[in-house]
Amino acid sequence: MNLHEYQAKELLKSYGLPIQEGIIAYSGDEAAAAFDKTPTDIAVIKAQVHAGGRGKAGGVKLVKTREEAKQVTDELIGKNLVTYQTDAAGQPVNFVLVAEDMYPVQTELYLGAVVDRSSRRVTFMASTEGGVEIEKVAEETPEKIFKVNIDPLVGLLPFQAREVAFKLGLEGKQINQFVKLMSGAYQAFVENDIDLLEINPLAVRENGEIVCVDGKIGIDSNALYRLPKIAALQDKSQENERELKAAEFDLNYVALEGNIGCMVNGAGLAMATMDIIKLYGGKPANFLDVGGGATKDRVVEAFKIILEDSSVEGVLINIFGGIVRCDMIAEAIIAAIKEVDVKVPVVVRLEGNNAELGAQILEESGLKLISAQGLSDAAQKIVDAVKA
């Protein structure tokens, strides 16, 4: 689950990090009132969406008067902001952050943290190349990114934070300020089950103070049950509707940009299914794992969710029966097709527990389903069916 910029900043502020202050506005009039309260002559209007690249997309603008603040806000609210991190539809802008202007600054830095799966530790990343896309820095000049792995038994140690500060070119009082900032960021990361934290830019102002000008936080969705205050911050308008619906039925669904819908049991098999679709020249429209203990109702809902995607031109159902019986899957497929007006080809591959019975049920249903023997055969048939 992602947080909005203003939510991320408030969370970081509660751990002692200095932030760019601002006020949320849901209308042009509220933005004008917020401008009057801004301590700087210039204010920054920031569209609040779950995506990076807002500046280049016109989602971040400087305003010098309350009238300008009202005009810019009215132009942003109600529109969809399209950035390099969104799909073609973009993300809806429901409100903006009216923030104080922090510029000019001495320099812009980058500070981030993730859970590194290879070391199985929280890893901090820092760079002198702040204010730009860190992915671009990692690709073109990886030597400019410093990494620090944190031992979970002892946590972030002061000498590690000081070492990062030295590499960032900080000096004097800035060293202690950065140590406090990085320590607070680590504490926030661990205590709130964060899986992604980015402060970009982390600005060094002309007076030498270090301030978080932007903040991005992603929370581990599996931990929301023990984070009620964080869970309450979820903005469902920024989430994919099909992914939200899938979560209600305990389905692991991720929307992609292809045209072949996939329904599979097991995450590994689901990834293999997407790989082989690509191998045969197709593009998967989604990742969908119905799980090892899928029920008939869940399978029906999974099928309906796939078909709600208007880009889907064909569906591949790939089931390996273990705990899940193939005959139950077959009955669920029939029920879903009868409930939903299916106008696209459907390829079904059943293997394992009661596979023969499942195939028989599908054959006797009278529905126009394409049966496949083996994973390669299934991928070839769905790709051919979509191209036909």
From Swiss-Prot:
Record-level GO BP terms: succinyl-CoA metabolic process; tricarboxylic acid cycle
GO molecular function, one term: succinate-CoA ligase (GDP-forming) activity
Residues reported in the UniProt entry to bind ATP: 46, 53-55, 100, 103, 108
Catalytic activity, reaction form: succinate + ATP + CoA = succinyl-CoA + ADP + phosphate; GTP + succinate + CoA = succinyl-CoA + GDP + phosphate
InterPro entries per UniProt: ATP-grasp (IPR011761), ATP-grasp_succ-CoA_synth-type (IPR013650), ATP_grasp_subdomain_1 (IPR013815), Succ-CoA_synthase_bsu_CS (IPR017866), SUCC_ACL_C (IPR005811), Succ_CoA_ligase-like_bsu (IPR005809), Succinyl-CoA_synth-like (IPR016102)
Cofactor binding annotation: Binds 1 Mg(2+) ion per subunit.
Record keyword Ligase present: yes
Enzyme superclass (EC): ligase
ATP-grasp domain span: 9-245
Biological pathway: Carbohydrate metabolism; tricarboxylic acid cycle; succinate from succinyl-CoA (ligase route): step 1/1
Keywords: ATP-binding, Ligase, Magnesium, Metal-binding, Nucleotide-binding, Tricarboxylic acid cycle
Annotated positions binding Mg(2+): 200, 214
Gene3D superfamilies reported for this sequence: ATP-grasp fold, A domain, ATP-grasp fold, B domain, Succinyl-CoA synthetase domains
Transmembrane regions listed in the UniProt entry: none
One of the record's GO cellular component terms: cytosol
Pfam family, one: ATP-grasp_2
Co-factor(s): Mg(2+)
SUPFAM superfamilies: Glutathione synthetase ATP-binding domain-like, Succinyl-CoA synthetase domains
EC number: 6.2.1.5
Binding, substrate: 265, 322-324
Assembly, per entry: Heterotetramer of two alpha and two beta subunits.
Function: Succinyl-CoA synthetase functions in the citric acid cycle (TCA), coupling the hydrolysis of succinyl-CoA to the synthesis of either ATP or GTP and thus represents the only step of substrate-level phosphorylation in the TCA. The beta subunit provides nucleotide specificity of the enzyme and binds the substrate succinate, while the binding sites for coenzyme A and phosphate are found in the alpha subunit.
Family: Belongs to the succinate/malate CoA ligase beta subunit family.
Name this polypeptide is given: Succinate--CoA ligase [ADP-forming] subunit beta
Source species of the chain: Psychrobacter cryohalolentis (strain ATCC BAA-1226 / DSM 17306 / VKM B-2378 / K5)
